[in-house]
């Protein structure tokens, strides 16, 4: 609980945890501040959850803290975790707020991300985060191809068919995890989404 008696958010618990495991508190503070600054108005817990679900087995918000602390054992683990979170944080902001994007130059990609935002789609974020982190180097054109496939999927399943949007959460997370393995091309990723 915080000073006002409210339960701490998962992001606050994780922040406390990584600081307790860190050997270099100043560096940890610098990285954490950079993550929060990059995210701007985005909820840090939601970002961390999408980030986690992009490279690990699907986890719900209530179990996120318990799951992450299983993986962070040493100061080196803390540093690697924060480096990766920091590396993806601006990218995440740009997919969530394409109209404020910093890094994307492809107008079609920006437009597609805006369309997904209009559709209130967020459950696909782990797929694009996985593409950012994968050993394959995906271009903006690759991201566009996948984002367009996601846009069709979201429109068809959630807008036309009326499925509940969060039903896609596990589906997209499972695809994201496979991007590090057998789904190692844009064609394979799009085929799986279709």
Describe the predicted segments one by one:
Residues 11-194:
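A cross-family structural signal marking well-folded subdomains
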């Amino acid at each position: 609980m915080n000073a006002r008696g409210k339960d701490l958010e998962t992001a606050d618990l994780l922040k406390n945890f990584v600081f307790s495991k860190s050997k270099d508190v100043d560096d940890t503070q610098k990285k954490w501040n950079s993550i929060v600054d990059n995210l701007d108005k985005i909820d840090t817990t939601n970002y961390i959850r999408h980030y986690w679900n992009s490279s690990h087995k699907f986890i719900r918000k209530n179990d996120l803290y318990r799951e992450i602390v299983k993986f962070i054992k040493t100061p080196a683990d803390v540093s690697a975790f924060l480096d990766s979170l920091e590396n993806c944080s601006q990218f995440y902001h740009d997919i969530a707020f394409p109209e404020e994007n910093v890094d994307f130059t492809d107008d079609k990609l920006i437009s597609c991300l805006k369309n997904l935002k209009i559709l209130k789609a967020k459950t696909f974020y782990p797929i694009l985060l996985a593409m950012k982190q994968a050993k394959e180097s995906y271009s903006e054109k690759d991201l566009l191809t996948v984002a367009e496939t996601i846009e069709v999927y979201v429109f068809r399943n959630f807008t036309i068919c009326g499925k509940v949007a969060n039903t896609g959460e596990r589906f997209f997370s499972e695809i994201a995890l496979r991007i590090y393995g057998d789904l190692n091309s844009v064609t394979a990723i799009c085929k799986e989404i279709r």
